[in-house]
Design a protein with these regions (language model features):
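Metal-dependent C-N hydrolase catalytic cores
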Residues: 2-131
Length: 131
């Protein structure tokens, strides 16, 4: 299954979220953790980070998704009631085409479930993999 390629959210992000106010986004989002994968029934938005930059002609260095998540989850939601899951990170494949394949299949699976994917990270070429 394509979800097997996702790396869970780090335990330090989980610990950070536990210190936040109950009104923050971090307390409203269902996380892919070391022990659990979110049930996607009733989920409207899915956050996915992609650790792939080779398409930009750069060395593939790891992005700071942990820092991004900590800043994002401390925010307060607006006047909306949308369910959201953080599915974790797609790590770079052995070849860039491997990453494209996983991202394409993951987006395809989410759209079939009527879940809007929010893809963070990677280079511009990943846009093509999503279509």
């Amino acid at each position: 299954m394509v979800f097997d390629f996702l790396q869970p959210v780090s335990s330090s992000v989980e610990e950070y979220i536990s210190t936040l106010s109950n009104q923050t986004l971090g307390k409203k989002v269902v996380l892919h953790t070391q022990t659990d994968f979110p049930v996607l029934e009733n989920i409207a938005l899915a956050l996915i980070t992609v650790n792939e930059n080779r398409g930009a002609g750069k060395e593939n260095k790891a992005d700071d998704f942990e820092g991004f998540r900590k800043e994002f989850y401390r925010l307060y939601p607006g006047n909306w009631a949308v369910s959201m899951a953080d599915l974790g990170t797609i790590e770079a494949g052995e070849r860039i085409e491997d990453t494209y394949f996983v991202l394409k299949k993951l987006v395809e699976e989410l759209v079939k479930k009527r879940i809007i994917p929010i893809v963070i990270g990677g280079s511009q070429d990943l846009t093509y993999a999503m279509y």
